[in-house]
C-alpha cells in the first residue's frame, strides 16, 4: 500500500523535486558541466589517444588518464585544503615551476635522439616515458586554472561551494559527475577515431590513394603537431599575462617603507605613556590624528569604512588595556616582544631604532628573485586608479570586497558574504590566543530558541508601549506629548545637555551636515590633552565579546558605568570636562576584575597585575595603497602651467587636442592694463577649447604598461574592431555575416525595399515626392561626406608623424600656389592674349592675386591670421584657409550689380569666396573634404565659340526652313491641281453616262454594260466616301490615333476586297449571259432578284463600315468618361455621408443643449443653494457645452463662480446618462466601493441609486457632510497627494516604487490666478451668481495666523503632518482594490475655499507654452487645457514638446490659442509674484528677471496672454530653454526641479537680481490696491515681506560695476556656505596666491571654476554652421589690423550674423545664460559629500536638503492654504475659539505614535515572528484593549470596518520604510554600505506579502 501511495502524482512530483534538489544531484550536474570546459590540459590526453599503439600505447593511455584524473582530484581537494590551495594559488610559485617544465617538455619532444643513445635498457626507458606521460597530464591540469585559464564552467563548483551545507558530499558528487563526463568524452573520441579508420569514403579519396603512407606519416608527425598546438596555446594564454621583465616600470614617489613612514608621521600620533602618567606626544606634521569625531578627516565617503589612522610597516603593537600579555604577536611578519610593553619611552625608542636598522638590513634579504621579477605594486593588470584628493596615493583594491564568514542571522548560523574581515580576524585571534577558553557549542535549535525568546521579549515591550499610547489616544487626550519624541544623544539626563544636531548620530537628514575642519592640530591636542589619566579602563568590545550568557551580559552591563566605557579624551565622542569623568567605585572595580579574570587568565608564569595606567588606542588596519602616484594628462598640464616639475602622465586618457580660439597678442591698452600683474603666472593670454577625437575611446583611463586585453567591461572580440563594445550589449551589436543566422531581417529589408519601389513607381508623377527624394538624397550625401571627412581626420590623427608631414606639405603647397603657380599662370595668360592681339590684363589679375589670403587655422578650423601659426601646429595639426581664392579668367568683364538686390543673400557666384587647401594643392569646401571642381580657364572660351557657332547655325537654319516651306507650297499646289483635274474628268464621265441612258443603242447586248456602269459609279462614290471619312479621322489628333487609323485601314481593305470579288463575279456572269436569245429582252426593264440581294448587301456593308469607324473613334473617350463618372459618384457619396450625419448630429445636440439649458433655468433655485464643498455640476456642463457648441455670446459681462475642475466627472456622467443602452453592471465595483462616495455629486448618486447601481449608504454619508465636521481621510489624502513634492521623484525610479494608482496619477489640475470668470451663456437673464463660501473667512484668518506661529511649532507640525501624510498614503495603498481606481483618474472635484478658482473663457490658451518642456504633466492636464484639445496625453507621466506634431495649416489655431492683444483687459488683475510658483508640488520654476523696466501699454502684443494675466507681469519662468539650443541643460534642469535638494545650485545661478525689482513690484502693488480684495492684499504683503526677508540671504545685486566685486564676495559667502566651505579648504590649489581679478567677469568665471562647474558651448544642428562661422570670423577679426573689408565680405556672404554678435563689452553670466550662449551644469563630485549625505540622498525620500528646506519654508504654508484643502478641515470648536492649529489627530496608521526607529524595529520584529498562520495573535491584545480602532482612526467607521485590511496594514511596509530598513539592515547587520553591494540585495526587496 505504501508503495502504491508513492506513485500518486503529487508524491511523485515531490519525490522528483527532492531528488533533483539534493546535494548529490547538484554535484553531479556541476561536475558534468566542468567536463565541457575543455582547456589545454586535454591536449596531452588526446595525444596519448591518437599516437600510441600496441602494448606500450595502452599503458601510456592508462597513465595519461590516471594523471589527468589525479590532477583534477587535486584541484577539487585544494578548494577545502588550505595548504594545497595556497601552494597552487600562488602565481609566482606556479610561474616559476611552469616555465622550466615547459622548456624541458619542448626540448624532450624535439631532441629525442639526444636521450636515445644514452638509454641503458629498453624497459627502463619505457617506464620513464610512461611516468613522463603521467606527470604531463598531472602537472598541466594544475596549470589549467592559473597559467592557462579555462572557462567559467570549471569554476562553477567553487561558486556553489559556499551555498552548500554538506561540503564533502558535494565535492565527491561533483568529482563523480566530472568523471562520468570525462569517460563519456573519451569514449566519444575513441568512436570517432574508429569511424575514421573504418570509413571507406575517406580511404577512397584521391589524395589518400595517391599517397598510401599518408596516414602513417600523419601519425608519425602527430607528436610535432601536438607540440605546436601546445606551444600556440601557451603563447596565447601567456600573452594575456604581462611579461615580468618587459612591463613598463613606473617611477614610484618613494620606496614602500618610506611611504609607510611618511604616512605614519602624517596620520598617526604615536603615544607612549610613562609610568607617572605623563604623555610624550609626537605631533603630526599637518593633521590632528586624534580619533575624535570633531577632528574627523575629510576622507572620501566611499572609503569611510576603510578610513585610516594607520602607520606603515613600523607601526607599534596596538596596546590593550587588559593586563595579560601575549607572548608573541606577529605584525607585518615582524615579532614584537613583550618587553616593548614593560618599559617606558627609553625602551620604545630603542625598539624603533632597532627596527629601522632591521628594515634596512632585511631589505635585500626579503627581496628574492621572484619579487624583483614580479613587482606586486606594478600596474600590470588593468586596474582602475581610484583617485582620492585627501590621501596622497590611491587605494589599492587588490581583492574582492566580499568576505565570507559565518554569522548569526535569524537565530541560525549562516554564511555572510559581506562579513567585516577585521572582525573575523579579531575573533580568530582571540580564540587562538585564549587557548583555554572553550565556549560551549550551541546547537542550532538552542540558538534559534534563544534568539526567538529575546526577540519576542523586545517585541512585547514595544507593543506594550504602543498599546499604552493608543489607549491614551482613545481617551481623547489629544496631545502631541503622546507621540514618541525623537531620540537625542545626551551625556546628562538631569541637565539635558544634548549633542549638537550636526553631530548627533541619532538624527539624520538635513540636520546631519558636514563635519567642519578645526584649526591647527596643536590647539586641539592641548584642548584634549589629559592631565591625569584614570587608573583603569574597561574595553567595551572585550566585555561584550567574552560574555556568552545573555542574562550575565545584562548584569555586566548594569554594573559597568556608562562613563567608564568611554575612551580616553582623544577618543571620546563628547567633550567632557575633567570633573564629569566618573570613577568606578572600589567594590565595583573588584567585581569587574573578578568577572573579567575568571574568563581571561593571563600567562601563568606571570600572574602579577600591572598597576600602570594604559590609555586605550583605536584598533585600526592598514589599507593597501599603491606606492606610485599617477597623474593624467590634465594634471600634467596643470603642473606645467604652475611651473612645477611634474612627471609624465601615466594614465592614458581619451585622445584630445587643445584648440586655441583666441590669443591676446595685442598691447593691453584698455582699462585693465593698470591692474595687470606682471608676476602673476595665472594670467591667461589664450582662450582654448578641448577637442576630443571622434574615435571610440579604447584607452578608458588605462594605466601605461597594463594589458588592454584583460579589461573586464570592454572586450575586443574581432580582428579589426572600430568601437569598444561591452559584452553586456553584445547582442545589440551588428555582428559579422558568419555570426548572424537571422534570415528574417534581410527578408524584411528586401520586402520593404520592393514595396517602396512599387510605391515610388506609382507616385513618380507627383513633384512633391520627387522633391522629398531629392532632399533625402542630398541629406544622405551630406552624411556620407561628413563621415568620410571624419574618417580622414582620424586617420591623420592616428598615424605616426602624420601631422608633421601634413603640416609641412600644406605650408609648401601654400607657398607654391601663392608665389609660383598663380604668378606663372598670370604671365602665360597675358602673353597669350598679346599673341592673339588682345589687350593684356595685368592689373586686374594682380589685384585678384593680391586679394587672395592664406589664413592659418587650427586643426579644427579656427582662423588665426596670415602670419601667425597655431601653437604646436606640427604635432596638433594645421589647416590653411584661402580667402577670396584666385581663379584665372580669360578676360575680365565689368558689370555693375543691380542695387535692388539684397546684399545679405548668398548668390551662386559667391560660393567660392573661401576654401581650404588640401595636401595635393586642391581646393575643398570643408577640411578633409573631397576636392571641389575648379573653374576651368578654357570653359568661357569654349562657351563663346559655341555661341558664335550657334548664331551661324541659326542663320543657316532660317534659310533652309524658308526653302522647305516654298517646296511644301509648290507640292500642295500641284496636289490641288491634280485633284481638280481628276474631279473634272469624273464629272465629264458622269455626264456621258447620263446621255447614254437617255439615248440607248437598240441592239441586244447593251443591257449588261448599263448595269455594269451603274455598279462602277456606286463603287466610285463609296470609295470617295471612305476616303473622305478616313481623311477626317486622320486630321483629328487623338491620343490613340495610330490604333484607330490601323483599324480603319483594315476595314477599308476588307470592304475593297469584297467589292472586287463581287465585281469579278458580275463580270463572269456577264460573259456567260452575253449570247442569250431575244426572248429574254421582253423582261429587260425589270431588275433581277440577285441584283436586289447584291444592292441590299452593298448598303448593309456601307452602314456597318461607317458605324465601326465611328465606334472605334469614340470608344476610348467613352471608357474614360464612364470611369470618371463612377469615381465622381463614389467620391461625392462618401463625402456626403459624414456631412449629413454631422449635420443631423449637430442639430440633435443643439436641441439637447437647448432643452438642457431650459431645464437648468427652471431649477435656478437649486443652483443657488450654498454647500460647503460642492458646486452644481449642471451649470458647469452648461458653460462648457455652450462654449463648445458655439452658441452666440449675448452678454459678455455675466459671471459665475464655479469649479471647472468638475467638468470631467460631470461631462462623463452626463454622457452616460444620455446613453440609451448602457451596461451598468460594469460600474458596480466602482460605485459600490466605499471610497467613491467621497468624490461623487449628489445628483449623480441619486441617478445611479434609481437604477440600483450604487449603495444607498452613499447618499447617507453624503448627507452628513453639512451636519458634521467632516474628517474624511480620503479627500485629505487626495489633496495631500497633490501637495507633496517628495513624490515627484525621478520618473523612471518613481514608476518602480509606486503602486498602480500612483502610476496613473497624471491628471493633476493646473493653477489659475485670475479672480473672475467671464462666463458665456445663451441666456440674457443669467446674472452674477456669487457662491458665498463659509470657509473663506476662516481660511483667510488661518493664513494670517499661520505666519504668527513660531519656528518650533512650525517644525513640529510640519514633521507631524509629513508622517501623517505618509501613513495615510500607505493605508490607502493597501486598501486600493483596482489598479485603475476611478478617483485616481479624476480631477480635483473640490472647490477651492479661499480663492474662487476661475478661468478665462478662452481655455485653450492657458498653458500651451508651459507644456513645451519636460514638466510634470499632472500640473498641466486641466480639462480645458490645450493637451485635451490636441489629444489624450493623460497616460503619460511626463510631457515633451516633441510629441506635438504641428503642421503649417495649424498655425492659425496656434495663434488663436495665444492671445497677444491687450484690448479690453483693463479690469483684469494680476498678482505679481517675485517667484512665480507655477507648480503645486513646491518645485521652483526659477525666474530670470528683466533688466529694464517694460511698459506694457506701449508694447502691445509683446507678452503672450496666458489666461489673460500677463499685462503687468515683469518676470517669466525659465522653462522655454528647450526651444533653444541647450537640450542637455534642460534635462538636467528638469531633473533638478524634481529633486532640488541634491545640489542647491539655484542660489548660485539665478538670483543675481537687481534690488530695483522689489521696489518696482511694491509700487505696482500699490497701484492695484483698489482692485484687490482685503484678503488678497494680505497675500501680496506677505509675498513682499518674503522677498524682503529673502533679499539679504541670497540675492546680492549686480547693480553697478563698482559694487559687483564686493557684492559678489558676499553672495559667495552666503550661498552654499555649508556645502562648499570644507571642499574649498581642501582644494589642491589652496596654496596659491589669491588672484587680483582684472574684471568682474573674470572673478565670476574663476568662481564657477572653483565650484567645479562644467560649462560648455553647445550648438544644435540648426545652428551649427551659423555659430561656428561667427566664432571663426570673430577670431580672425581680432587679429587683423584693418578688418573692414573682411567684415563687409563676411556679412555679405552670411558668415557673420549681427544678431549673434553681442556689442556689450562686459556680459554677466546671467546675461550669457539668458541669451543661451553659455550653459552651466554642476559637476557631480562624490568627494564633496560624506557617506551619510549620499546615502540619504539615494534612499530617503523624506529628506530634503536644508537649503531647500529653508527656502521653501515661507511658501509651504502659503501654497498649502492657497492651493490645497489640507488645512481646511478644522474642528468647529477650534474655529470658535480662534485657535487655528490644524487637526492632525485622525491617525490612519497607529504606529505613527512611535518614533521612526522604534516603528521600524516593531515592524521587523513582527515579521520575524510571523509563524502563526491566522495572524490574529499579533493584534489580539491591541483589539481587546482599545475600544474602537475606527474612532481612533477616523469618524467614518466604514474605512476600517474590514478587519482583514487592518491585518494587511500590519504586514505592509511602505516602500520608503522598506528602503530605509533595507539600508539599515545592510549597513549594520551585514556591513554593506557600498552601492554596488546594495544593488545585489535589491532583487529581494519586495517579497510577496501573504494574507495570513
Curated annotation (Swiss-Prot):
Chain spans, region Disordered: 256-299, 1613-1636
Composition-biased stretches (Polar residues): 280-294
Gene name of the encoded protein: TIC214
Name this polypeptide is given: Protein TIC 214
Keywords: Chloroplast, Membrane, Plastid, Plastid inner membrane, Protein transport, Transmembrane, Transmembrane helix, Transport
InterPro entries: TIC214
GO cellular component, one term: chloroplast inner membrane
Assembly information from the UniProt record: Part of the Tic complex.
Main location: plastid
UniProt membrane topology term: Multi-pass membrane protein
Gene Ontology terms: biological process: protein transport
Source species: Gossypium hirsutum (Upland cotton)
Transmembrane segments: 12-32, 68-88, 89-109, 128-148, 176-196, 225-245, 1115-1135
Localization per Swiss-Prot or TrEMBL: Plastid, Chloroplast inner membrane
Function: Involved in protein precursor import into chloroplasts. May be part of an intermediate translocation complex acting as a protein-conducting channel at the inner envelope.
Keyword Transmembrane: yes
Family (UniProt): Belongs to the TIC214 family.
Tree of life domain: Eukaryota
Biased composition (Acidic residues): 256-266
Matching PANTHER family: PROTEIN TIC 214, PROTEIN TIC 214-RELATED
Amino acid at each position: 500500500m505504501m508503495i502504491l501511495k508513492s506513485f500518486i502524482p503529487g508524491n511523485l512530483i515531490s519525490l522528483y523535486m527532492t531528488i533533483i534538489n539534493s546535494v548529490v544531484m547538484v554535484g553531479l550536474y556541476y561536475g558534468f558541466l566542468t567536463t565541457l570546459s575543455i582547456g589545454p590540459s586535454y591536449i596531452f590526453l588526446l595525444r596519448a589517444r591518437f599516437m600510441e599503439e600496441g602494448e606500450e600505447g595502452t599503458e601510456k593511455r592508462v597513465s595519461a588518464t590516471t594523471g589527468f584524473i589525479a590532477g583534477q582530484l587535486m584541484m577539487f581537494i585544494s578548494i577545502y585544503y588550505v595548504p594545497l590551495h595556497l601552494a597552487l594559488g600562488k602565481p609566482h610559485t606556479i610561474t616559476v615551476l611552469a616555465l622550466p617544465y615547459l622548456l624541458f617538455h619542448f626540448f624532450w619532444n624535439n631532441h629525442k635522439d639526444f636521450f636515445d643513445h644514452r638509454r641503458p635498457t629498453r624497459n627502463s626507458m619505457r617506464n620513464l616515458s610512461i611516468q613522463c606521460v603521467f606527470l604531463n597530464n598531472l602537472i598541466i591540469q594544475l596549470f589549467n586554472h592559473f597559467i592557462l585559464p579555462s572557462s567559467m564552467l570549471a569554476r562553477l563548483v567553487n561558486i556553489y561551494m559556499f551555498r552548500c551545507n554538506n561540503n564533502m558530499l558535494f565535492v565527491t558528487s561533483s568529482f563523480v559527475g566530472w568523471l562520468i563526463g570525462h569517460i563519456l568524452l573519451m569514449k566519444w573520441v575513441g568512436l570517432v577515431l574508429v569511424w575514421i579508420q573504418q570509413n571507406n569514403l575517406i580511404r577512397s579519396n584521391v589524395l589518400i590513394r595517391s599517397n598510401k603512407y599518408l596516414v602513417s606519416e600523419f601519425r608519425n608527425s602527430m607528436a610535432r603537431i601536438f607540440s605546436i598546438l601546445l606551444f600556440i596555446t601557451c603563447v596565447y594564454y601567456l600573452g594575456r599575462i604581462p611579461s615580468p621583465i618587459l612591463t613598463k616600470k613606473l617611477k614610484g614617489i618613494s620606496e614602500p617603507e618610506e611611504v609607510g613612514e611618511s604616512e605614519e608621521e602624517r596620520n598617526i600620533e604615536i603615544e607612549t605613556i610613562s609610568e607617572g602618567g605623563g604623555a610624550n606626544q609626537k605631533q603630526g606634521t599637518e593633521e590632528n590624528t586624534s580619533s575624535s569625531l570633531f577632528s574627523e578627516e575629510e576622507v572620501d565617503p566611499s572609503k569611510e569604512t576603510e578610513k585610516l589612522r594607520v602607520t606603515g610597516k613600523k607601526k607599534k603593537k596596538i596596546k590593550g588595556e587588559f593586563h595579560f600579555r601575549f607572548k608573541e604577536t606577529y605584525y607585518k611578519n615582524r615579532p614584537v616582544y613583550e618587553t616593548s610593553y614593560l618599559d617606558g619611552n627609553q625602551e620604545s625608542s630603542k625598539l624603533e631604532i632597532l627596527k629601522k636598522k632591521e628594515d634596512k638590513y632585511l631589505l635585500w634579504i626579503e627581496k628574492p628573485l621572484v619579487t624583483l621579477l614580479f613587482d606586486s605594486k606594478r600596474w600590470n593588470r588593468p586596474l582602475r586608479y581610484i583617485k582620492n584628493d585627501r590621501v596622497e596615493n590611491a587605494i589599492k583594491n587588490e581583492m574582492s570586497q566580499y568576505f565570507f564568514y559565518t554569522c548569526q542571522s535569524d537565530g541560525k548560523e549562516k554564511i555572510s558574504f559581506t562579513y567585516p574581515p577585521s572582525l573575523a580576524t579579531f575573533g580568530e585571534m582571540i580564540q587562538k590566543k585564549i587557548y583555554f577558553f572553550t565556549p560551549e557549542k550551541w546547537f542550532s535549535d538552542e540558538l534559534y530558541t534563544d534568539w526567538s525568546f529575546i526577540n519576542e521579549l523586545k517585541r512585547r515591550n514595544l507593543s506594550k508601549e504602543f498599546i499604552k499610547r493608543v489607549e491614551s489616544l482613545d481617551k481623547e487626550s489629544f496631545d502631541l506629548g503622546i507621540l514618541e519624541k525623537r531620540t537625542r544623544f545626551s551625556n546628562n539626563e538631569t541637565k539635558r545637555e544634548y549633542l549638537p544636531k550636526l553631530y548627533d548620530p541619532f538624527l539624520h537628514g538635513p540636520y546631519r551636515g558636514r563635519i567642519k575642519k578645526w584649526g591647527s592640530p596643536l590647539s586641539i591636542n592641548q584642548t584634549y590633552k589629559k592631565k591625569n589619566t584614570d587608573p583603569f579602563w574597561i574595553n567595551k568590545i572585550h566585555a561584550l565579546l567574552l560574555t556568552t550568557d545573555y542574562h550575565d551580559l545584562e548584569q555586566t552591563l548594569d554594573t559597568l558605568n556608562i562613563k567608564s566605557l568611554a575612551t580616553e579624551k582623544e577618543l571620546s565622542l563628547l567633550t567632557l570636562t575633567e570633573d564629569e569623568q566618573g570613577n568606578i567605585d572600589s567594590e565595583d572595580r573588584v567585581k569587574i576584575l573578578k568577572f573579567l579574570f575568571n574568563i581571561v587568565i593571563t600567562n601563568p608564569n606571570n600572574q602579577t597585575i600591572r598597576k600602570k595606567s594604559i590609555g586605550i588606542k583605536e584598533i585600526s588596519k592598514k589599507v593597501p595603497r599603491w606606492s606610485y602616484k599617477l597623474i593624467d594628462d590634465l594634471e600634467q598640464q596643470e603642473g606645467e602651467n604652475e611651473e612645477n616639475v611634474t612627471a609624465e602622465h601615466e594614465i592614458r586618457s581619451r585622445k584630445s587636442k587643445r584648440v586655441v580660439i583666441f590669443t591676446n597678442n595685442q598691447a593691453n591698452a584698455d582699462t585693465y592694463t593698470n591692474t595687470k600683474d606682471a608676476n602673476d603666472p595665472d594670467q591667461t593670454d589664450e582662450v582654448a577649447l578641448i577637442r576630443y577625437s571622434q574615435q571610440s575611446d579604447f584607452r578608458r583611463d588605462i594605466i601605461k604598461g597594463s594589458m588592454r586585453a584583460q579589461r573586464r567591461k570592454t572586450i575586443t572580440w574581432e580582428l579589426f574592431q572600430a568601437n569598444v563594445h561591452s559584452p553586456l550589449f553584445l547582442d545589440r551589436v551588428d555582428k559579422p555575416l558568419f555570426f548572424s543566422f537571422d534570415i528574417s531581417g534581410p527578408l524584411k529589408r528586401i520586402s520593404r525595399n520592393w514595396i517602396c519601389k512599387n510605391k515610388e513607381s506609382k507616385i513618380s508623377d507627383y513633384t512633391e515626392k520627387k522633391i522629398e527624394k531629392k532632399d533625402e538624397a542630398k541629406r544622405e550625401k551630406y552624411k556620407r561626406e561628413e563621415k568620410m571627412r571624419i574618417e580622414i581626420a582620424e586617420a591623420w590623427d592616428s598615424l605616426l608623424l602624420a601631422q608633421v608631414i601634413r603640416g609641412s606639405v600644406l605650408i609648401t603647397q601654400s607657398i607654391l600656389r601663392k608665389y609660383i603657380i598663380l604668378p606663372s599662370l598670370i604671365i602665360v595668360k597675358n602673353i597669350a592674349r598679346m599673341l592673339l592681339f588682345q589687350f593684356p590684363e595685368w592689373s586686374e589679375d594682380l589685384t585678384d592675386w593680391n586679394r587672395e589670403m592664406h589664413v592659418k587655422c587650427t586643426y579644427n578650423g579656427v582662423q588665426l591670421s596670415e602670419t601667425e601659426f597655431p601653437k604646436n601646429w606640427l604635432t596638433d595639426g594645421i589647416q590653411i584657409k584661402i580667402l577670396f581664392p584666385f581663379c584665372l579668367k580669360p578676360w575680365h568683364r565689368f558689370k555693375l550689380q543691380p542695387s535692388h538686390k539684397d546684399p545679405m543673400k548668398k548668390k551662386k557666384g559667391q560660393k567660392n569666396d573661401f576654401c581650404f587647401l588640401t595636401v595635393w594643392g586642391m581646393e575643398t569646401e570643408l577640411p578633409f573634404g573631397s576636392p571641389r571642381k575648379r573653374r576651368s580657364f578654357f570653359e568661357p572660351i569654349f562657351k563663346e565659340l559655341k555661341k558664335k557657332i550657334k548664331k551661324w547655325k541659326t542663320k543657316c537654319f532660317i534659310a533652309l526652313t524658308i526653302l522647305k516651306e516654298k517646296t511644301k507650297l509648290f507640292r500642295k499646289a500641284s496636289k490641288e491641281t491634280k485633284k481638280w483635274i481628276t474631279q473634272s474628268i469624273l464629272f465629264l464621265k458622269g455626264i456621258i453616262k447620263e446621255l447614254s441612258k437617255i439615248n440607248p443603242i437598240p441592239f441586244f447586248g447593251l443591257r449588261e454594260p448599263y448595269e455594269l456602269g451603274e455598279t462602277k459609279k456606286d463603287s466610285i462614290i463609296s470609295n470617295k466616301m471612305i476616303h473622305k471619312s478616313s481623311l477626317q479621322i486622320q486630321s483629328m489628333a487623338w491620343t490613340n490615333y495610330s490604333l484607330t487609323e490601323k483599324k480603319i485601314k483594315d476595314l477599308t481593305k476588307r470592304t475593297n476586297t469584297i467589292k472586287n470579288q463581287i465585281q469579278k463575279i458580275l463580270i463572269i456572269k456577264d460573259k456567260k449571259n452575253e449570247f442569250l436569245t431575244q426572248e429574254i429582252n421582253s423582261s429587260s426593264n425589270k431588275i433581277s432578284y440577285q441584283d436586289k440581294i447584291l444592292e441590299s448587301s452593298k448598303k448593309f456593308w456601307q452602314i456597318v463600315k461607317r458605324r465601326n469607324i465611328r465606334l472605334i473613334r469614340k470608344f476610348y473617350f467613352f471608357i474614360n468618361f464612364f470611369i470618371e463618372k463612377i469615381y465622381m459618384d463614389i467620391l461625392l457619396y462618401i463625402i456626403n455621408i459624414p456631412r449629413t450625419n454631422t449635420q443631423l448630429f449637430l442639430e440633435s445636440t443643439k436641441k439637447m443643449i437647448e432643452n438642457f439649458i431650459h431645464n437648468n433655468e427652471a431649477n435656478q433655485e437649486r443652483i443657488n443653494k450654498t454647500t460647503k464643498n460642492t458646486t452644481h455640476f449642471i451649470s458647469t456642463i452648461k458653460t462648457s457645452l455652450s462654449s463648445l457648441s458655439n452658441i452666440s455670446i449675448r452678454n459678455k459681462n455675466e459671471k459665475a463662480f464655479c469649479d471647472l475642475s468638475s467638468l470631467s466627472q460631470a461631462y462623463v456622467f452626463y454622457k452616460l446618462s444620455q446613453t440609451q443602452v448602457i451596461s451598468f453592471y460594469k460600474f458596480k465595483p466602482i460605485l459600490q466601493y466605499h471610497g467613491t462616495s467621497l468624490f461623487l455629486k449628489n445628483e449623480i448618486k441619486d441617478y445611479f441609486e434609481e437604477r440600483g447601481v450604487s449603495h444607498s449608504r452613499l447618499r447617507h454619508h453624503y448627507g452628513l457632510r453639512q451636519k458634521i465636521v467632516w474628517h474624511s481621510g480620503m479627500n485629505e489624502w487626495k489633496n495631500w497627494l497633490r501637495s507633496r513634492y517628495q513624490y515627484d521623484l525621478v520618473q523612471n525610479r518613481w514608476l518602480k516604487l509606486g503602486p498602480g494608482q500612483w502610476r496613473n496619477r497624471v491628471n493633476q489640475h493646473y493653477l489659475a490666478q485670475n479672480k473672475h470668470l467671464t462666463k458665456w451663456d445663451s441666456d440674457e437673464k443669467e446674472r452674477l451668481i456669487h457662491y458665498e463660501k463659509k470657509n473663506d473667512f476662516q481660511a483667510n484668518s488661518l493664513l494670517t495666523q499661520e505666519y504668527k506661529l513660531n519656528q518650533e511649532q512650525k517644525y513640529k507640525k510640519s514633521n507631524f503632518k509629513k508622517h501623517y501624510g505618509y501613513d495615510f498614503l500607505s493605508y490607502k495603498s493597501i486598501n486600493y482594490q483596482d489598479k485603475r481606481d476611478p478617483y485616481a483618474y479624476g480631477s480635483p472635484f473640490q472647490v477651492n475655499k479661499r480663492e474662487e478658482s476661475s478661468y478665462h473663457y478662452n481655455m485653450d490658451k492657458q498653458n500651451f507654452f508651459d507644456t513645451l518642456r519636460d514638466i510634470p504633466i499632472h500640473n498641466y492636464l486641466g480639462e480645458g487645457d490645450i493637451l485635451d484639445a490636441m489629444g489624450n496625453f493623460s497616460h503619460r507621466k511626463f510631457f515633451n514638446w516633441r510629441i506635438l506634431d504641428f503642421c503649417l495649416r495649424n498655425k492659425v489655431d496656434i495663434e488663436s490659442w495665444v492671445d497677444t492683444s491687450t484690448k479690453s483687459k483693463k479690469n483684469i488683475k494680476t498678482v505679481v509674484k517675485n517667484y512665480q510658483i507655477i507648480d503645486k508640488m513646491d518645485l521652483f520654476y526659477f525666474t530670470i528677471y528683466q533688466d529694464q523696466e517694460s511698459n506694457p501699454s506701449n508694447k502691445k502684443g509683446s507678452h503672450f496672454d496666458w489666461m489673460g494675466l500677463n499685462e503687468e507681469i515683469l518676470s517669466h519662468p525659465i522653462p522655454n530653454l528647450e526651444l533653444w539650443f541647450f537640450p542637455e541643460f534642460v534635462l538636467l534642469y528638469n531633473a533638478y526641479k524634481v529633486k532640488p535638494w541634491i545640489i542647491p545650485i539655484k542660489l548660485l545661478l539665478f538670483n543675481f537680481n537687481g534690488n530695483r525689482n522689489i521696489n518696482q513690484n511694491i509700487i505696482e502693488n500699490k497701484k492695484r490696491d483698489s482692485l484687490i480684495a482685503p484678503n488678497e492684499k494680505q497675500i501680496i504683503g506677505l509675498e513682499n515681506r518674503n522677498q524682503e526677508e529673502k533679499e539679504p540671504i541670497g540675492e546680492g545685486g549686480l547693480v553697478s560695476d563698482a559694487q559687483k566685486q564686493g557684492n559678489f564676495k558676499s553672495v559667495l559667502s552666503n550661498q552654499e556656505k555649508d556645502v562648499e566651505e570644507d571642499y574649498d579648504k581642501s582644494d589642491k590649489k589652496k596654496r596659491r596666491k589669491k588672484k587680483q581679478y582684472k574684471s568682474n567677469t573674470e572673478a565670476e568665471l574663476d568662481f564657477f571654476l572653483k565650484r567645479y562647474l562644467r560649462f560648455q558651448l553647445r550648438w544644435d544642428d540648426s545652428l551649427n554652421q551659423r555659430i561656428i562661422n561667427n566664432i571663426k570670423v570673430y577670431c580672425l577679426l581680432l587679429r587683423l589690423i584693418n578688418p573692414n573689408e573682411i567684415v563687409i565680405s563676411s556679412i555679405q556672404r552670411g558668415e557673420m550674423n549681427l544678431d549673434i554678435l553681442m556689442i556689450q563689452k562686459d556680459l554677466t553670466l546671467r546675461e550669457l545664460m539668458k541669451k543661451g550662449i553659455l550653459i552651466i551644469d554642476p559637476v557631480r563630485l562624490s568627494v564633496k559629500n560624506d557617506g551619510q549625505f549620499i546615502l540619504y540622498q539615494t534612499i530617503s525620500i523624506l529628506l530634503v536638503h536644508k537649503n531647500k528646506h529653508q527656502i521653501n519654508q515661507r511658501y509651504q504654508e502659503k501654497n498649502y492654504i492657497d492651493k490645497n484643502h489640507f488645512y481646511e478641515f478644522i474642528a468647529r470648536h477650534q474655529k470658535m475659539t480662534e485657535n487655528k492649529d490644524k487637526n492632525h489627530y485622525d491617525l490612519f496608521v497607529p504606529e505613527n505614535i512611535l518614533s521612526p526607529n522604534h516603528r521600524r524595529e516593531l515592524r521587523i520584529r513582527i515579521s520575524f515572528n510571523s509563524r502563526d498562520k491566522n495572524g490574529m495573535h499579533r493584534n489580539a491584545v491591541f483589539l481587546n484593549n482599545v475600544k474602537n480602532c475606527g474612532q481612533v482612526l477616523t469618524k467614518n467607521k466604514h474605512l476600517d470596518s474590514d478587519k482583514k485590511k487592518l491585518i494587511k496594514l500590519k504586514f505592509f511596509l511602505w516602500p520608503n520604510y522598506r528602503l530605509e530598513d533595507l539600508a539599515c539592515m545592510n549597513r549594520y547587520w551585514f556591513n554593506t554600505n557600498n552601492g554596488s553591494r546594495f544593488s545585489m540585495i535589491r532583487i529581494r526587496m519586495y517579497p510577496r506579502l501573504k494574507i495570513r
